[in-house]
Amino acid sequence: PENPLNVPEVETTTARLARHTGTVIHSALQAIVESKLVTNHECITADAFINQQHSFWKIQLQQLGWHGDNLTRALQKIAQSIRTSLGSEQGRWLLNSDHQQSACELSLMQKNKHDVSESIIDRTFVTEGIRWIVDYKSSEPESGETETAFIAREMETYKEQLLRYQKLLAATEPRPIKTALYLV
């Protein structure tokens, strides 16, 4: 085992802020899809959504213990992620609620030898006969890391997770399945 003494790992303030910010971003993207704010015929503007949700995000982060500069940075990251997502054709395609079998935070259970494990898929849908499985990531390149190196590192880090999701859904349907990371 990686941690045979079961010693708790100490999470840095930066890592904890990034994790909490990512959770709020996931919830915001889920709200966009489930509220049908992006469809084949219309799309909410990023500024309208940010203005509508900003106070809610602030309260969520404050309840998690964030204040001052950290709170400001987190809110800026969330707003930028929404602007990037709603401002790009790829982001609007991903968040389009008109896709067939559209779902967010899809929970799948898998029985193992001695227990049951849960996998939660951030975003999935079917378009043109293909099942898409998308995992959102709000991480950022390390200092001095090129964009190409960052993307390669993220793909390597999450490859097994995406393959597990693909295998779980492949057991339930015969259609082709594609997986993707969406870096917000």
Please annotate each region the language model reported.
Residues 135-154:
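Short beta-strand-loop-alpha-helix junction that forms the active-site gateway
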